[in-house]
């Protein structure tokens, strides 16, 4: 025990030098949310509910009234104060009976608005068909511009628990959020240094099996494991939103020298120094831009995505134009980092 905590004190002292805790980069297999769904009615709408042409809504009203001993045909119901909705929620791990969870409500008929209404008691089912929660509550307008969907904080009560016996387990599996051979081995080696050999073994680039030391319960063991810092190797990645023109990337992602043309813009990227002229502008990190010839120079240093984006802004390229140029750089091989298009 003493050896374990001495090691933890050592690694925590250097936490600023280490990128992540194990709990930030890996989840415990089996400890997860479960999705719930239900069909219900929102009542009390001021004429903004489903029209009588929404037959499933009228039939649902008829069924609801019949459950309280009021019998009426769906064809005779003309109300516009009720809307049919779908309710979704996430059941968190280890949720107990009586706990409250948030719910999301969405109209599925032709209602104009469900704001100001009340969701009547609706069972929420999981994929196994069992009822795990009951949802009910008033819908407030909030700040949303969407009148056909809403959230109710603590809008459902847990009625059935998902049983999971963590306490008596001897072994668990960690799953890295992003598969990486190096990170899997780092987790394995770090845990074995802290708790002793053969506590952890990497099964593949995403999965590490861990065995509980006898001196700890599984809850204690996982609590310690999740707090241990680790040298985390993250993939270089560029995220591009084509619709908004938003670009997200690491500042140190490299771009190889190249000439790229997209639409009516041509940009030359080079490491060669530029001749000083009135058209040459100094950018950050010793980079220079010749605005007359659209030439970006790193003056012998590595060129980064951040520098390219700044140069394109100086030239006056639109956000969507930047997206097109980055895509062209990726296709040409000038960017080796992974690119995700949203």
From Swiss-Prot:
Keywords of the record: Bacterial flagellum, Periplasm, Signal
Chief place of localization: periplasm
UniProt-annotated location(s): Periplasm; Bacterial flagellum basal body
InterPro entries xrefs: Flag_FlgI
Keyword Signal: yes
One Gene Ontology cellular component annotation held by this UniProt entry: bacterial-type flagellum basal body, distal rod, P ring
GO molecular function, one term: structural molecule activity
Signal peptide: 1-19
Function of the molecule: Assembles around the rod to form the L-ring and probably protects the motor/basal body from shearing forces during rotation.
Family classification: Belongs to the FlgI family.
Subunit structure: The basal body constitutes a major portion of the flagellar organelle and consists of four rings (L,P,S, and M) mounted on a central rod.
Protein name as catalogued: Flagellar P-ring protein
Organism: Helicobacter pylori (strain P12)
Name of the coding gene: flgI
């Amino acid at each position: 025990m003493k050896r374990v905590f001495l090691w933890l004190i050592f690694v925590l002292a250097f936490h600023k030098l280490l990128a992540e805790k194990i709990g930030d980069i890996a989840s415990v297999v089996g400890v997860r949310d479960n999705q719930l769904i239900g069909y219900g009615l929102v009542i009390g709408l001021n004429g903004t509910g489903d029209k009588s042409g929404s037959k499933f809504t009228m039939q649902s009203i008829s069924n609801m009234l019949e459950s309280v001993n009021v019998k009426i045909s769906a064809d005779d119901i003309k109300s516009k104060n009720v809307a049919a909705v779908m309710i979704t929620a996430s059941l968190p791990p280890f949720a107990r009976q009586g706990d409250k969870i948030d719910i999301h409500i969405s109209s599925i008929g032709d209602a104009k608005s469900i704001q100001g209404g009340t969701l009547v008691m609706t069972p929420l089912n999981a994929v196994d068909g069992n009822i795990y929660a009951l949802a009910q509550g008033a819908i407030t307008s909030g700040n949303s511009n969407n009148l056909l969907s809403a959230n109710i904080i603590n809008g459902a009560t847990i009625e059935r628990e998902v049983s999971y016996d963590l306490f008596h387990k001897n072994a668990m599996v960690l799953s890295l959020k992003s598969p990486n051979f190096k990170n899997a081995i780092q987790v394995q080696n770090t845990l074995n240094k802290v708790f002793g050999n053969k506590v952890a073994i990497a099964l593949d680039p995403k999965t590490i099996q861990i065995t509980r030391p006898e001196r700890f319960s599984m809850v204690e063991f996982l609590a310690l494991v999740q707090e241990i810092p680790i040298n985390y190797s993250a993939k270089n990645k560029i995220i591009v939103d084509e619709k908004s023109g938003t670009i997200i990337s690491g500042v140190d992602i490299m771009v190889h020298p190249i000439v790229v043309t997209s639409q009516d813009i041509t940009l030359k990227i080079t490491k060669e120094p530029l001749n000083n002229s009135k058209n040459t502008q100094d950018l950050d990190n010793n980079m220079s831009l010749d605005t007359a010839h659209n030439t970006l120079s790193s003056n012998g240093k590595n060129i980064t995505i951040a520098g390219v984006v700044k140069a394109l802004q100086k030239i006056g390229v639109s956000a969507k134009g930047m997206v097109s140029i980055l895509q062209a750089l990726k296709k040409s091989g000038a960017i080796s980092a992974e690119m995700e298009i949203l």
